[in-house]
Every structure is written in C-alpha cells, then in structure tokens.
C-alpha cells in the first residue's frame, strides 16, 4: 500500500478537492483506496457521507482502545473506504488532559504502525491533512511515502511554499518524498502563466502537471459528485490523470498507472443506500489520458 499525504501549512489551496478527485479517479482505475480524513473540518468525510459523530474516534484509535478495522467505513463508491474526521481530536491532542496520547505520538511512528495493519488490504491510502504543523503532522510525514503539496501560482503562495518545502526537506522527521503541484490555475492571469512557465527551472519538486480552476471542480462539494462522476466526457478528468501519471513516474510506481482499468460503480455485493452518494451506470468509461 502506497501512502500519500495531501498537505499544506495553509488552507484554501484545494487539498480536500484534490483528495476526493484522486480517490475517485484511482477507484475508477480499479485500485482499492483508503481515505483517511485527518482534517477536523471533515470535508472529505462530508463528500462521502461519512461525517464523524465527534466521539474521539482518533484518540481512542491511537490509544489502542479501537482497532483500525473498527473505524474504517465503507462508502457507496465501490473500492473506496473512509476513516472519517474527528473534529475533537486536534483540540484534545493539544490539551494537557491528553498527555498520554501526546506521549504516544512523540516517537512519530504511531501513524505508520497503525496503517501497517492494513497495508495488504489497499493499493493506496490518501490522507487529507489539516493545515498547520503539529506533532500529528510529523507522524503523518513519517508514515507517508509521498507528501503531495497543492499550491496556488501566486507570489505569496509560491514564497511560502518554497519556505515550507525547504524546511520539510531539512527536517529529520520527514521521511516522505516531497512533490508539489499548482492547483486552481487560471491561465488567463499573467502571474499564473509566469509561474507555470518557470516551474522546474529552479525547483525540481514542482510537477509539470497542474490542475486548472474549473467550475465543475469547485462544485463537487455541493453536488457530492467528483468530476469523474459529474461528466462522462470532461477535459478536466485528463488533468488529474496526467497529474497521477507524473506522480507515478517520479515515484517509480509504474504498477499503479491504469493498472486494472475498472469502472467505479456501486458494489454488487453491498447495494448502495438510498440515495447513493455517487451514481454511475455500468457503461461509464474512463477517459483515456491524452498525450498532448
């Protein structure tokens, strides 16, 4: 199982939207996906209809009162399971009353140990991280194979992103490979075009692939449908497919590129609840990635 953490120290860069669309794209390609929503806001959990009941699930999991299998929830989207958000966990973790949990986190291996229990059950685990930088994040960085950082191509965002990546690369606690990509790109803006044209000249961690700012991407939280379910034919899909292909090439994950080419649908073994979060016909086909 490959572990990818979607992270940025600041909010508003599209971490959750990217998480949801990547999960649905990978499931559509036939990969089994575990989504772990570590953002207390719970956007990813909301999308899949699996909002947490604020019962300290994460705290009890890390304190070994629960197993990871007890907190994993199935979804109506075939091939995607979710560990939903826990809005109380961050506050409790930082609270003095949670000293035991904090001590358990100090070795920064607890997240990795927890995910190792399901490493043979999924192809990919995607973690939707909260903004900021806490001890929790160091645990995530230790567990993740890839730290994927969405960023907006604007001066302050680029400056802050460079500082963040330099700090992460010099940190002994960060074991992950670090890659970044431009998100919410508007090519009609001269500054966005400028940063697109200069990427990779000085920073080889910035991917060539980018995700544009399209209304259909922005609307996924309202419709509770990823772009891979809203439209059968959409050029937006291709941007995510190209992004994933470049990630796999940089990470040498060739076995995860269109490996099975199945179609996301509702599990035949477990009929979806009514109404389902995602509805797809059996004849929906995956858009082929363009080489252009």
Named regions from a protein language model:
Residues 1-292:
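P-loop NTP-binding core
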